Amino acid sequence: IEHAAMSAFWNGGQNCSANMRQLIAAPLVEEFTGRIIDRVKAFKLGDPLDPSTDIGSMITKDHKEMVMSYIQSGIAEGAGMLMGGDSDFPGHFIKPTVFENVTPEMKIAKEEIFGPVLGIMSVKNADEALKIASDTDYGLHATVFTQNIDQALHMARSLPCGTVSVNGFSEGDIKTPFGGYKQSGSLARDNGTEAIEQYLQTKTIWVQTKNT
C-alpha cells in the first residue's frame, strides 16, 4: 500500500513515472480501496520545504487548472471520486484525489495528468490487466505487484515500456538505462552506457592486405 500510494502521489503526482492508474484484481478491489484511502488521508499538504509535508502545490496556476480539468472530466465520465479535489489552501494546491470505477476509455485513464490523481480500475485477471496497461500512447514506466515471480517476469517482459518495477516503485541506478517507448521518449536513453552511445557513431573499416 505504501508503494502504491507513493507511486501515485510522490511530488504531488508531478512525476513522469507516476502510477496514476492502478489495475487491481477484482476480488481485492474493495480491500485495496479502503487501505489506499486510509493511507492517502494521512498525507499532509503544505510547504514543500517543510520536512513534514507530503504533498506540495502544483507548479503553476495554469497547471493546477489543467489538473482540475482532469478531475472534472473523471466526474463527468462517471468515475466515482472518493476523496480529493480543490483545496482551501492559499496557492495552487490540490487535495490528493482518488477515483474508483475508472474504465479504460475515460480521459483520466488514457492521458498523463501530472497531478495528485489516482484512478482505481478493476480487472478480471492478469491478461486483462496487461491488455489495459498496454493500451496507451505512453510507455515510460510500469509497476507490477505480485507474489508470483513467474507472473511478474511475464508481465515485465510483455509491458511495452522502458522500465518495469516489481513489488516496488521506480527503482533506478545511474548505471541502468532510463527512457520510454511510444510517446514517452525517443530512441535515446538516460544513464548507463546507452546514454553515451547516443552521442557516438559506429564505423566499419575493411582493409585488404597482401597476405589475404
Regions of interest found by a model, annotated:
Residues 1-103, 132, 166, 211:
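ALDH superfamily catalytic-core signature
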Residues 44-45, 71, 86, 93-212:
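Conserved C-terminal structural/oligomerization subdomain of aldehyde/semialdehyde dehydrogenase
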